[in-house]
Regions:
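Short coil/turn motifs at secondary-structure junctions
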Residues: 59-62, 217-219
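His/acidic metal-ligating clusters that form di-metal
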Residues: 39-55, 65-106, 128
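Structured beta-strand-rich core segments of catalytic domains in phosphoester-bond hydrolases
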Residues: 1-51
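Active-site-proximal beta-strand/loop segments in catalytic clefts of secreted hydrolases
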Residues: 11, 19-21, 57-59, 91-95, ...
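Metal-dependent phosphoester-hydrolase catalytic domains
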Residues: 79-89, 96-222
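Conserved hydrophobic/aromatic beta-strand scaffold that supports enzyme active sites
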Residues: 5-7, 40-44, 56, 165-167, ...
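Short, solvent-exposed aromatic-acidic interface loops
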Residues: 20-27, 60-61, 181-193
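Short catalytic/ligand-binding loop motif for oxyanion handling, primarily in non-cytosolic enzymes
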Residues: 1-5, 16, 25-26, 62-64, ...
Length: 222
């Protein structure tokens, strides 16, 4: 994809597609130099002789929940068409921040209110119709524990904890799921003399990684 989307797999990739998402924000108007628009990368993997559909997704942050719903529905329709009848894992930064990323006043209001900050972690589905749309098509969102995956810096210092990154599972049952901190101090697994061991920044990313172990071909109880 043109916006950094990719699928990395230890299993053979049999087929792959790029799905263009409906535009919900024009990044060109302020002369940001970009190639293409938001997209998702879908692929079919061969996991020990069993097919598995996967997708790498990055939804728009500078829009409201309805805009993100329209974008995710485009991915859900593509998965139905391209990956029918097989287990599917859709994952990525869905930007489910519970507000319109263009609304600076709303961001300041949330930053100053502990009650509003809690909604960004605990009540995401009430404000983000994309998650409801996925559930309606038999996808299960993980991690289910309300935990931040994004540290959004605030103008006055500090950061706003957001829950933006998800795995959406169809035909899969998660046995466990969690997030992995990308703060450099938490990355104690670096091999000596590796690029990670030499990295001197405060964090590898402002998003934490989302991780899950799943069983294939087991119908979700939900």
């Amino acid at each position: 994809g043109f916006h950094g989307n990719a699928v990395f797999s230890r299993w053979p990739i049999r087929r792959a597609w790029t799905v263009r998402l409906p535009e919900q924000y024009n990044w060109y108007f302020d002369r940001q130099r970009r190639i293409g628009g938001r997209c998702a990368v879908l692929a079919e993997l061969d996991v020990g002789g069993r097919p598995l559909g996967v997708a790498s997704i990055h939804l728009e942050n500078r829009t409201h929940g309805e805009g993100r719903r329209l974008q995710l529905e485009a991915v859900l329709r593509a998965a139905e068409e391209l990956l029918p009848g097989i287990p599917v894992v859709l994952g990525g930064d869905l930007n489910t921040n519970t507000f319109d990323g263009r609304d600076k006043d709303a961001i300041r209001e949330i930053a100053g209110s502990p009650a509003l900050q809690r909604r960004c972690l605990e009540d995401v589905a009430q404000y983000e119709a994309a998650l409801t749309a996925a559930e309606a098509m038999a996808y299960r969102a993980v991690p289910e524990t309300p935990i931040l995956t994004r540290r959004k810096p605030l103008p006055g210092g500090g950061c706003l904890g957001l829950r933006l990154d998800w795995l959406l599972l169809r035909g899969m049952t998660p046995t466990k799921s969690r997030t992995l901190s990308t703060r450099t101090a938490d990355c104690g697994f670096a091999r000596p003399d590796s690029a990670l061991a030499r990295f001197a920044g405060e964090e590898l990313s402002d998003h934490n990684a989302v991780w899950a172990a799943c069983r294939m071909g087991v119908k979700d109880a939900k």
